[in-house]
């Protein structure tokens, strides 16, 4: 999700109050603040993400650009580890950030930040974390690789059961993992995370999707979208062979080989149109029909791989 400081949130609300009442919340109010600061000769705002080549960085850039903000020159972008984001916001080192939970929720609970948009609102059911291994390791350890994928699939299915979320929250809130208060961790896992204004939202059951909607399937259309954004922002050359990179890095054939013994349904196609579904839908072109969630982008664009 993207969180801004409480002071910046107040400025956005004053500059463009009408845009702050609609979800998904666009960055037009932020653009108004940025334009005003330019006129007044004030320094650029600073936003943080966790790593240059990350979904968080791409989501932040996408959200900004959709409102006409050029993330390359209208603001300053910096890299900060997730666990240090809240302190950086509190100290004024940064004005906002894009990061995973519980670091958005933590800022809201502390009263220093407001979450303006979630990753799922920028791109519904877009990819987030991946399991990636070296090609040579996969070749040399095929059986282990397949078992690892099966274990991940079964674990994801278990975590996706809302009845197990409290147990997960208790486990990962400990010092050995996230090392954050249970109350800050449990919100996003149960779809009741705090958002703008610090109010409790109870209508985000798909805030975290671990297994349903073919969430573990490595869609090559996801890979191509990621590559398109890397090219867009100069992180990959225009000459990159998108088709080759997508096929060599995202391997649905290996995934399906691994999960087939578990009875997990697999799509028959390796890619799909992204952004064409605003509501739940049924994928029939699969080993058996798969209930799917929305895949729309916040700006209504469609990505054709």
Please provide the spans of the model-predicted regions.
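Short acidic active-site motifs
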Residues: 84-85, 103
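Inter-helical turn/loop segments and adjacent helix faces that build the functional surface
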Residues: 70-75, 139-145
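Hydrophobic residues within well-ordered alpha-helices
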Residues: 60, 88-90, 230
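Conserved C-terminal helix/tail region of periplasmic/extracytoplasmic solute-binding proteins
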Residues: 224-305
């Amino acid at each position: 999700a993207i969180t801004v400081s409480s002071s910046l949130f107040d400025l956005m609300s004053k500059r463009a109050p009408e845009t702050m009442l609609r979800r998904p919340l666009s960055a037009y109010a932020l653009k108004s603040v940025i334009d005003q600061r330019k006129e007044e000769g004030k320094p650029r705002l600073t936003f943080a993400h966790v790593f240059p080549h990350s979904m968080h960085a791409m989501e932040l850039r996408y959200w900004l650009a959709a409102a006409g903000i050029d993330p390359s020159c209208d603001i300053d972008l910096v890299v900060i580890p997730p666990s240090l984001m809240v302190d950086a916001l509190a100290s004024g080192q940064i004005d906002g950030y894009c990061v995973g939970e519980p670091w958005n929720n933590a800022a809201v609970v502390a009263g220093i930040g407001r979450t303006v948009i979630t990753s799922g609102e920028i791109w519904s059911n877009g990819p987030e974390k991946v399991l990636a291994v070296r090609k040579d390791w996969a070749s040399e350890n095929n059986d282990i690789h397949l078992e690892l994928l099966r274990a991940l699939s079964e674990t994801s299915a278990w975590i996706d059961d809302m009845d197990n979320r409290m147990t997960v929250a208790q486990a990962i809130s400990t010092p050995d993992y996230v090392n954050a208060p249970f109350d800050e961790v449990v919100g996003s896992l149960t779809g009741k995370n705090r958002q703008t204004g610090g109010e409790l939202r109870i209508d985000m059951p798909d805030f975290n999707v671990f297994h349903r909607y073919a969430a573990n399937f490595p869609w090559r259309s996801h890979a191509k979208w990621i590559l398109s954004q890397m090219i867009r922002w100069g992180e990959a050359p225009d000459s990159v062979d998108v088709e080759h990179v997508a096929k060599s890095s995202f391997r649905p054939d290996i995934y399906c080989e691994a999960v087939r013994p578990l009875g997990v349904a697999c799509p028959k196609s390796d890619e799909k149109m992204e952004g064409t579904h605003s509501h739940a839908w049924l994928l029939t072109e699969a080993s058996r029909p798969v209930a799917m969630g929305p895949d729309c982008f916040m700006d209504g664009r469609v990505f054709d791989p």
